[in-house]
């Protein structure tokens, strides 16, 4: 069918959501707008679905949700998995609606849907999958994307985002269905009355927080003063529950960002990695003067932070810096209190800081590196569990502000990260040090490992083709020098024998020890460039990264 024919079909059939009809009527005759909504089906992969909320096959709406869920139901029934699925959502627009639509499809296919009655974090969904013995999980979230986005993450029975093989099998099942005529659907209220849709009770969340608290080294945090922002997302309830149980009583929540609001009015891009999202909280810090500011993204799986800079202001801690801070803290405290397991394992990703390597060596920890995406870190926990030794896992992190110190869930967990950050801050405060002092101490001990990230956005069908062309060009005409330094080695993770699954990632290793990696984002229309340098000073390493970034910008033109 042509895009115009698809438009006409959707205008005739997509009648259950008035917002979609209004949108379609508004673009009638606009070829570009119609093409953008219908030129493809919204891509499904290991991250599930993610896209702009709206009308069409390339948008997030009740029809794309139903079709994806029908494919998932077919997969579960064919694979003989437990016929139970846990479902959660965060504060994004239409999150509750999409969750209920997924539950309706599952119930119609003989699968019991366990539904959180209100918004909850992504890690609480990962927890619920294992806690309830489900065959899969669904989390309706677009993480830290702008407000116009929503998404549909799928989890396996292990509580980890589905593997490449499972994603391919689910996609094959999805592709057998159209959007309107082959979807099994039941009435929501009738399914609840029949026990086919079950509300998850509060005990599940309390037990999740208990599991996080069980990982505490136990340092006194009672003197810690904290500013916290959930960025209008799902973090407030579990994080406050955790802090109360820990004994952190001096907590100021950023009022403008306290209540759930899918419009994210104070930060159009609710990502705690960036200053814009943290700016409202940083202004409050000028008045409250906390020891630590913490922000969690809308689905509360990422955590950002800021600490006093010693000059009267506050300095953001990067994801890599927090990762090595927590890694070092966990190692030293577990060795100190005698709880370090035999043959401990930590896991990070290929784009995360190389400082993790000397820290692991110092403490006798095996460090494993995976492809980008916390699902691969969760997969490593599963491998250890299959060997009968999940206790060997002590920590995992990625540069994009994801952390996990236990096997209670199989995804990054900002509730866990808040606990660790508070403990680490209190540990150093007892020694008269701030977290910034601790970061600088690590730099002095291991070298000034500095990292940076450049993102380049390419919207729509034209942008998708341009991204593909850039990656193809870098493969056929690899640069010989970058920022004046010779390229010592090129690693193509799509073709070279790296020991990891094939991935669309290119890595350039320079003669000076610097590194540049290029990959298309799996969830956004972006190419991401990861920069890494180590030098004798922060300024020298940053200068190398800046020069490499300038080179990368030329590639993206």
Regions found by a protein language model. Give the residues of each.
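Short acidic, glycine/serine/threonine-rich loops at helix termini
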Residues: 96-101, 126-130, 148-154, 175, ...
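Phosphate-binding and adjacent anionic-ligand microenvironments
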Residues: 286, 290-292, 313-315, 333-519, ...
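N-terminal small/polar loop signature for handling phosphorylated ligands or for N-terminal nucleophile
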Residues: 86-149, 245-305
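Glycine-rich phosphate-binding loop plus the immediately following alpha-helix
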Residues: 155-185, 320-344, 348-359, 414
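Conserved phosphate/anionic-ligand binding catalytic regions in large, soluble enzymes, centered on
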Residues: 38-58, 142-143, 230-242, 298, ...
